[in-house]
């Protein structure tokens, strides 16, 4: 698709890939940065991107939680995406806490960063 690597899917200038291996947040982010140039855990910026992401992840993972690149790196500091993208779209399920993850029903959940979870990597096309 467009300029994505084999096995990656294209959507609006970015490439995405769902990984069916469970890692904690830090290891998943590190994996994404090593897997592809400028790769990171997914950051989401619109309902359309969320719908695309879900159409990609749900057939593979069914109902589950996937890591996304949102975490509060230091206590009392603003939330940010791991790729430094602006937090211009939000879908918190309850209150934001330490780390962000995402389920297949568009809700964002706080989760223990050390829990192994599936994840989606994203990189510029």
From Swiss-Prot:
One function term, GO molecular function aspect: toxin activity
Xref: InterPro entries: C-type_lectin-like, C-type_lectin-like/link_sf, C-type_lectin/snaclec_domain, C-type_lectin_CS, CTDL_fold
Tissues of expression: Expressed by the venom gland.
Localization: Secreted
Taxonomy of the source species: Eukaryota, Metazoa, Chordata, Craniata, Vertebrata
Top-level taxon of the source organism: Eukaryota
Main location: secreted
Pfam families named in the record: Lectin_C (PF00059)
Taxonomic source organism: Daboia palaestinae (Palestine viper)
C-type lectin domain ranges (all copies): 11-122
A cellular component term, taken from the record's GO annotations: extracellular region
Cystine connections: 4-15, 32-121, 98-113
Role summary: Inhibits integrin alpha-2/beta-1- (ITGA2/ITGB1) dependent melanoma metastasis.
Subunit structure: Heterodimer of subunits alpha and beta; disulfide-linked.
Gene3D superfamilies in the record: Mannose-Binding Protein A, subunit A
Family as reported in the entry's similarity comment: Belongs to the snaclec family.
Keywords, alphabetical: Disulfide bond, Hemostasis impairing toxin, Platelet aggregation inhibiting toxin, Secreted, Toxin
Protein name per the record: Snaclec VP12 subunit B
């Amino acid at each position: 698709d467009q300029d994505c690597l084999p096995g990656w899917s294209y959507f609006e200038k970015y490439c995405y890939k769902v990984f069916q291996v469970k890692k904690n947040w830090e290891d998943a982010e590190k994996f994404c940065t090593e897997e592809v140039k400028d790769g990171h855990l997914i950051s989401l910026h619109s309902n359309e991107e969320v719908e695309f992401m879900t159409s990609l992840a749900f057939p593979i993972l069914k109902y589950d939680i996937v890591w996304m690149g949102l975490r509060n790196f230091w206590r009392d500091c603003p939330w940010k995406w791991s790729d430094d993208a602006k937090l211009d779209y939000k879908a918190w399920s309850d209150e934001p806490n330490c780390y962000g993850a995402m389920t297949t029903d568009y809700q964002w959940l706080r989760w223990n960063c050390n829990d192994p979870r599936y994840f989606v990597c994203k990189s510029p096309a």
